[in-house]
Amino acid sequence: MSLIYRLRKSKQPHFIQGVYDYIGEMKPFVKRVRKPHLLLPMLLFKSIEWGIYRWYKTPIRRFYGVKGNELIYMITNACNDRCPKCGIWERPEPQDQHLLVMHFINCLKRLHHNLYQVTLTGGEPLIFKKDVMLIAEEAKKLNVPMVIVTNARFLDEAFLTRYKELGHILVISVDSVEREKWNEFRGRKNFDIVMPKILLAKQILGDQLRIQSVLSKESAEEIPKVKEWCKQHNIQHNIQFNQDFGGTWTNTKTEEVNYDNDTPCAARKNICVYPNGDVVKCFDHRRIPLAKEPLGNIAKQDIIEILCTKRSTEVSKIMKSCNLPCKNMSCNKPQTLLFN
């Protein structure tokens, strides 16, 4: 199923627009039905499905039904740590290019009927803690689950207590639980500061806390220790393969892509926003044909208008057969496969 319906034109009759939408959906569908004797019943079922999605709550189309998309906001490139696995912190956005939080909240409001989750990442999201909490409060009002991926340096009791009340998920990046390696992997000597904050987060958040580790040649011996530590503290743990974000870490020799070409990348359902408001389908977006430039910018355009462009739809179609290494990133995996 394609992502969107065409936007209604203000001067176009409502009925005529519906006819255009119907024909535009059915023509490509009919071409995909290989067995002639199944054409009429399949067309009937497709028409019923079309009617439900055409008139239910929102004009944006779903991939697999209601709440089929994830909205991911890289709120900043800036970071207080200097992790060698990542080079994002080397390119902090200028202050005058940082998106005003209300632009993102407006985007969230426009899309919330379609979202199963909103995720905030970085850089370090909690550098903008006030903005993060505004988004968390709005997500709660809109009944959209939220996830923050953080290094935990800026966590405090007040933030954690309110976050717990909102019912959202917190994911903390941990690649070692030993002081020396921790400080090496973080590029900062902050083990004794951050570890107590992680334990405080567990105490307050309980099952709303997750730990995520990056598997690379450098961290391979540390990850089993992190996994065991999480088991001892009853914290769900996820391992993500190393990706090229401009860092110096290298992939393990045994690393393999877990998806074949027949399994569509989940990122085609993603809606990703950069710190300046640029919209892409995936943070490796520019490696995809037709995607060398952003699809639009939510500070200048309505998000639905951006998603309704032909290029946005074509990029999503291309991603059905995309098999780049970023397919193994957490944001591109089905949620049921992430934590154990």
Language-model regions: role of each:
Residues 3-7, 19, 62-63, 67, ...:
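Flexible mid-to-C-terminal extensions adjoining Fe-S/redox cofactors in radical SAM and related proteins
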Residues 17-20, 25, 32, 38-169, ...:
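Conserved alpha-helical substructure of the radical SAM core
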Residues 64-65, 260-265:
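Short loop/turn motifs at secondary-structure junctions and domain boundaries
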Residues 72, 76, 80, 262, ...:
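Residues immediately within or flanking Cys/His clusters that coordinate Zn2+
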Residues 92-94, 178-185, 249-250:
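A short acidic, helix-capping loop that chelates divalent metal ions and anchors anionic groups
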Residues 112-121, 140-147, 168-174, 192-254, ...:
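Conserved C-terminal portion of the radical SAM core fold
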Residues 128-129, 155-157, 219-223, 280:
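Short, well-ordered alpha-helical microsegments
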